[in-house]
Design a protein with these regions (language model features):
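Short, mixed-charge aromatic SLiMs
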Residues: 48-54, 214-221
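A broadly conserved detector of short glycine/acidic/proline-rich loop/turn motifs that flank catalytic sites
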Residues: 5-7, 52, 151-152, 161-163, ...
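Acidic/histidine-rich
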Residues: 115-118, 122-123, 128-162
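His/Asp/Glu-rich mid-to-C-terminal helical/loop segments that flank catalytic regions of hydrolases
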Residues: 22, 28, 32, 83-87, ...
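Catalytic pocket of metal/acid-base enzymes, prominently hydrolases
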Residues: 34-36, 58-62, 149-164, 168
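Soluble non-cytosolic domains of exported or imported proteins
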Residues: 17, 115, 182-185
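Midchain, well-structured core segments that form catalytic/ion-binding scaffolds
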Residues: 1-113, 139-146
Length: 221
């Protein structure tokens, strides 16, 4: 997002419209959003990973650019946050005499596995590969595969690549990240076991209702 203000000199701030002041007010106002709008039973988080404005200490810049992400486990929470985010930003920009320009806005739905697909995979993988599947805690990484699962029933799994003997298993997006490539073999075997079971059994996925997701996907466009 880019906030446009009016540049000026630090000796006469009254002649400028500071996008920094505008962003600060917006940032603070957003802090209370979760307490006011998100059920305590649900989880929503957001962060700004980039804020850039100006390059001279005595000059008020004419624009500020910021970027970040929001994560949730309930699509309705994410879509509501998205709508309220833009409304709050517009209102505060109007108050300060600034304008906001949307540089990029993407929404990926929550990645939610279909239970019947999970049950089929668990059985098939146990028979063909062994007891290698584990349940995990919900994870807030954004995932484009969620778009596929919004149209077709399926499941999303992780392949274990941690091996303390080799020193692998550091968190993603860190300099220490590395993988134990032998884990990829198990991942391929597990994927094939699931695909073969799906082709052989051709289960009826009764819990998947594509029409239920239509409004959510339209709202996310």
């Amino acid at each position: 997002v880019k906030i446009h203000g009016k540049s000026g000199h630090g000796s006469m701030p009254s002649l400028a419209v500071s996008p920094i002041d505008c962003f600060h007010t917006f940032y603070m106002a957003l802090q209370s959003y979760r307490m006011r709008k998100v059920s305590p039973r649900n989880c929503l988080t957001y962060s700004f990973g980039m804020v850039q404005a100006g390059d001279t200490p005595n000059v008020i810049p004419d624009e500020l650019t910021f970027a970040g992400t929001a994560r949730c486990f309930v699509n309705e929470d994410g879509l509501s946050f998205r709508e309220d985010f833009w409304k709050l930003l517009k209102d505060i920009c109007d108050n300060y005499g600034c304008t906001a320009e949307i540089m990029e806005d993407q929404y990926f739905p929550v990645t939610a596995n279909n239970k019947e697909c999970v049950d089929l995979a668990r059985k098939a993988i146990a028979e063909r590969v062994g007891d290698v599947m584990e349940d995990t805690e919900p994870w807030m990484a954004s995932e484009t595969f969620a778009i596929t699962e919004s149209t077709y029933p399926g499941l999303f799994t992780f392949t274990g690549v941690k091996n303390e003997a080799l020193g692998t298993g550091a968190n993603h997006h860190t300099p220490e990240f590395d993988i134990d490539e032998s884990g990829l073999k198990v991942g391929v075997e597990a994927a094939l076991a699931y695909v073969l079971a799906m082709l052989e059994e051709k289960p009826e996925i009764k819990s998947f209702h594509k029409e239920d997701l239509k409004l959510m996907l339209e709202r996310a466009e």
